Amino acid sequence: MSSAGKVASLPEVAKRVAAARGGGKQIALANGVFDLLHVGHIRYLEGAKALADVLVVAINADASARANKGPGRPVVPAPERAELVAALACTDHVLIFDEPNVRGVISALQPDVHVKGTDYTPETIPEREAVLAYG
């Protein structure tokens, strides 16, 4: 699939995930701003992909990126950040979300694995309760 074909809306990604799950595939979800893509992002996403058959990456929309990163951010607009992340071999599906966290995305996709960066502990993951809600 081309990188442009990997970027889709949450409802479309949910359909793709359901089809993959129906085929016995494990689903991982990673999320972040991914502004000024760097090697740490690549390592995070490659590590996430190693945990499942299908990797979905949820990217913060510009407004939520600005709320998280501060004024002047993001440098790169969300559609371009999505396209950059989609161009990586390790990603299967990419979506843009406009909430402060990915609880809604987690509830919609119910991934087998929700992957966060090393700056979080299990206790400090904002979406912890959303993951625990479906097991």
Enumerate the language-model features and the residues they cover.
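Nucleotidyltransferase catalytic core that binds NTPs
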Residues: 1-135
